[in-house]
């Protein structure tokens, strides 16, 4: 099979999985994305949060520009605390690589009891952030801002 065919097949499979409401893909960032979609009822695309304010997306510095950006800073800080946990500080066990289990029922997020200490901590970081995102207003003027100007 040609690589282009494999990519097409993969795209179809991923689309079908999403359409069938099958549980999220087992990758932490996909889990976080799906938590955000659960909490905000799918009202905003997850990519809208990727380059927002000073803290939503990669890195972060300065003072958060608004409530939503504060949610991202709190999430970043929470992941920083997770990395300090002995259960989370070995290779491929940190917040970006550890897979946890959770439920989304009627837009309510619950981290499951079968998570170990590290997974439970990370799940709660993501859960808290997703709920925070859902409750914070989205200000379009804070998307893709000049970080050198606004985030020092």
UniProtKB/Swiss-Prot annotation:
Keywords, in A-Z order: Calcium, Disulfide bond, Hydrolase, Lipid degradation, Lipid metabolism, Metal-binding, Secreted, Signal
Tell me which residues this entry annotates as catalytic.
75, 126
Q: What class of enzyme is it?
A: hydrolase
State where it is primarily located.
secreted
Q: Where does Ca(2+) bind?
A: 55, 57, 59, 76
User: What tissue expression does the UniProt record report for this protein?
Assistant: Expressed by the venom gland.
Record-linked Pfam families: Phospholip_A2_1
Q: Which residues form the propeptide?
A: 22-27
InterPro entries, per database record: PLipase_A2, PLipase_A2_Asp_AS, PLipase_A2_dom, PLipase_A2_dom_sf, PLipase_A2_His_AS
- CDD domains attached here? PLA2c
Superkingdom in the source lineage: Eukaryota
GO MF assignments: calcium ion binding; calcium-dependent phospholipase A2 activity; phospholipid binding; signaling receptor binding
Per UniProt, the cofactor note for this protein states: Binds 1 Ca(2+) ion.
Give the GO biological process terms: arachidonate secretion; fatty acid biosynthetic process; lipid catabolic process; phospholipid metabolic process; positive regulation of fibroblast proliferation
Signal sequence region: 1-21
What reaction is this protein's catalytic activity?
Answer: a 1,2-diacyl-sn-glycero-3-phosphocholine + H2O = a 1-acyl-sn-glycero-3-phosphocholine + a fatty acid + H(+)
List, alphabetically, the Gene3D superfamilies matched. Phospholipase A2 domain (1.20.90.10)
Its annotated compartments are: Secreted
* SUPFAM superfamilies, per the entry: Phospholipase A2, PLA2 (SSF48619)
Q: Which cysteines are joined by disulfide bonds?
A: 38-104, 54-151, 56-72, 71-132, 78-125, 88-118, 111-123
Name the coenzymes or cofactors required.
Ca(2+)
What family name appears in the similarity comment?
Belongs to the phospholipase A2 family. Group I subfamily. D49 sub-subfamily.
* Function in brief: PLA2 catalyzes the calcium-dependent hydrolysis of the 2-acyl groups in 3-sn-phosphoglycerides.
Q: What is this protein's record name?
A: Acidic phospholipase A2 57
